Every structure is written in C-alpha cells, then in structure tokens.
Amino acid sequence: IRTPGGAAGQIVGGVTQLYDMMATCFELAGVTARHTHFARCLVPQLDGTPGDPHRAGFVEGGYNVHEPECFENLPLKPEHIYYPKIRLQNEQPETITRATMMRTTECKLVLRPDGVSEFYDLQRDPRELENVFGHHTYAARQAAMQQAVLDWNIRTSDVTPHGLKDERDMPRDKLRVLAPQKT
C-alpha cells in the first residue's frame, strides 16, 4: 500500500495476512467495519513501526474425500497449467483433505484430520523440504502450535451478524448483566 506522504519502499516485516489489507484500507479511508473480523491494521507498520514478532497467520481450506462434488474435472490437455494439480487430487484425494495451517516466522504447522499433517522449522528449512511432524525435537513447539490452532478456531469460528434485532425485546442492559463483558 502506498500512502500520501508515507515512507517510500517501506516493507512490513513479520507475518501478515491478506485480510489485513481490508483493516488497513478501512483505517486509511476512515471507514468503520460493520462486521466482525480478525484482521489487523498495518498503518503503523507503513510508517515504520515494527510489527508483532510473535504474530501467527492462520489458513483453513480443502475438502473431504467424501465430497467429490468439490473435485475439479481433469482438463483435456496435459499441457494445461493446472493438469498436474488436478490429476493429483483425482488420483490421490487424500492430498487435498481439509486442513488448518498456522505459520509464524519460525515454524509452520499444517493439521489434516484425514491425511498427512506437517511441521516445518522455517529457520532451518525455509523451503519446507523436511516434514518433522511428530519428531521429538519439536514436540513442545508442535504442541503449543496445535493448542494455538484450537484456540484460534474457537475464537473465530462462529461470529454473529451485526445489527440483528433482539426478537425477545429484552433491554440491552439486561443482556449485559446476563453476559458480562471482559475487564
């Protein structure tokens, strides 16, 4: 993002996520989000402030082998750019099963309930060539990241829409008593 008067060539280091662009653009435009999101505004980093060195990025996706309607059809020509990917998912569907990934600047964890999970030490293996999932050397870090994935899923999985009218006509102050806010 280039901002008027912003530092030229400023690179935001650390882990960021694509949806951070939304929060950043909202901040720059003076817009308030009208929905729950988990993006972080990167405006301070655009001005040179270091990002959170302990931040993790999370991604989820894929589909299960019992969901063939999600599989892509094989292109007719082997020269097609996606031919190898589509052929692999049709021949070995376990390679595209549902997964959740967590990445920090140091490690990457990919959890698949129906397939091979992965853990990479990005400091030692930045190209992710050696899967060390389950290796005793990384047991503590892997366990901590697995707990962080669970915590992230619980915090972000089921948000309620903004602006819904309470059909019970219960006064808002009574709702706050029933569900006290964190302090």
Where are the regions that the model predicts?
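Substrate-binding rim/cap in mid-to-C-terminal beta-strand-loop elements of soluble/periplasmic
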Residues: 1-36, 40-54, 59-62, 68
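Generic structural signal for secondary-structure transition and capping sites
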Residues: 5, 30, 50-54, 107, ...
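A structural signal for well-ordered alpha-helical segments within the folded catalytic domains
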Residues: 16-23, 37-40, 96, 104, ...
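Non-transmembrane alpha-helical segments in soluble domains
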Residues: 19-26, 30, 43, 120, ...
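Short secondary-structure transition/capping segments
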Residues: 57, 81-89, 157-165
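C-terminal, low-complexity/hydrophilic appendages and adjacent surface loops
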Residues: 60-134, 171-173, 181-183
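Long, internal low-complexity/basic segments
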Residues: 62-66, 132-183
